[in-house]
Amino acid sequence: MTETANLFFLGAAGGVEWGTVIVQVLTFIVLLALLKKFAWGPLKDVMDKRERDINRDIDDAEQAKLNAQKLEEENKQKLKETQEEVQKILEDAKVQARQQQEQIIHEANVRANGMIETAQSEINSQKERAIADINNQVSELSVLIASKVLRKEISEQDQKALVDKYLKEAGDK
């Protein structure tokens, strides 16, 4: 069995043809050199270019992610500022509405007080006129009664003086 293995390794003729082995080794080396120059070099260049493209795409993606995060932060800040501004506008509107309400109530009170004062002065003036009318009627009635009592007629001027005198005496009591 060892002999069969030796025949297999040594070749069928039983000897190694070193010329063929050297030619095959040289052919293999030339083939490797040609592959390196014409296949491995361009293939390596393509792989290097692809690696650079992938790295550039990764860098671009990271930059885009950073830009997106920055934009998101800016949008959050703008949203916060907008919400604060809306809140301030609402608060200002509430304050202004309260002020307008107070002003309207104040103006209504001023008008109501003015109307009350006008009504009171009108009432007082009508009261004074009514009192004056009553005084005139009382004086006329007093003169009439006095003239009937005395059964004599006195002048109108004397009657008024007499009534005024009685009214003054009645007012003093």
UniProtKB/Swiss-Prot annotation:
<keyword id="KW-0138">CF(0)</keyword>
<keyword id="KW-0375">Hydrogen ion transport</keyword>
<comment type="similarity">
    <text>Belongs to the ATPase B chain family.</text>
</comment>
<comment type="subunit">
    <text>F-type ATPases have 2 components, F(1) - the catalytic core - and F(0) - the membrane proton channel. F(1) has five subunits: alpha(3), beta(3), gamma(1), delta(1), epsilon(1). F(0) has three main subunits: a(1), b(2) and c(10-14). The alpha and beta chains form an alternating ring which encloses part of the gamma chain. F(1) is attached to F(0) by a central stalk formed by the gamma and epsilon chains, while a peripheral stalk is formed by the delta and b chains.</text>
</comment>
<keyword id="KW-0472">Membrane</keyword>
<comment type="function">
    <text>F(1)F(0) ATP synthase produces ATP from ADP in the presence of a proton or sodium gradient. F-type ATPases consist of two structural domains, F(1) containing the extramembraneous catalytic core and F(0) containing the membrane proton channel, linked together by a central stalk and a peripheral stalk. During catalysis, ATP synthesis in the catalytic domain of F(1) is coupled via a rotary mechanism of the central stalk subunits to proton translocation.</text>
</comment>
<dbReference type="GO" id="GO:0045259">
    <property type="term" value="C:proton-transporting ATP synthase complex"/>
</dbReference>
<dbReference type="InterPro" id="IPR005864">
    <property type="entry name" value="ATP_synth_F0_bsu_bac"/>
</dbReference>
<feature type="transmembrane region" description="Helical">
    <location>
        <begin position="15"/>
        <end position="35"/>
    </location>
</feature>
<dbReference type="Pfam" id="PF00430">
    <property type="entry name" value="ATP-synt_B"/>
</dbReference>
<keyword id="KW-0406">Ion transport</keyword>
<keyword id="KW-1003">Cell membrane</keyword>
<keyword id="KW-0066">ATP synthesis</keyword>
<dbReference type="InterPro" id="IPR002146">
    <property type="entry name" value="ATP_synth_b/b'su_bac/chlpt"/>
</dbReference>
<dbReference type="GO" id="GO:0046933">
    <property type="term" value="F:proton-transporting ATP synthase activity, rotational mechanism"/>
</dbReference>
<dbReference type="GO" id="GO:0005886">
    <property type="term" value="C:plasma membrane"/>
</dbReference>
<comment type="function">
    <text>Component of the F(0) channel, it forms part of the peripheral stalk, linking F(1) to F(0).</text>
</comment>
<dbReference type="InterPro" id="IPR028987">
    <property type="entry name" value="ATP_synth_B-like_membr_sf"/>
</dbReference>
<protein>
    <recommendedName>
        <fullName>ATP synthase subunit b</fullName>
    </recommendedName>
</protein>
<dbReference type="InterPro" id="IPR050059">
    <property type="entry name" value="ATP_synthase_B_chain"/>
</dbReference>
<keyword id="KW-0813">Transport</keyword>
<keyword id="KW-1133">Transmembrane helix</keyword>
<keyword id="KW-0812">Transmembrane</keyword>
<dbReference type="GO" id="GO:0046961">
    <property type="term" value="F:proton-transporting ATPase activity, rotational mechanism"/>
</dbReference>
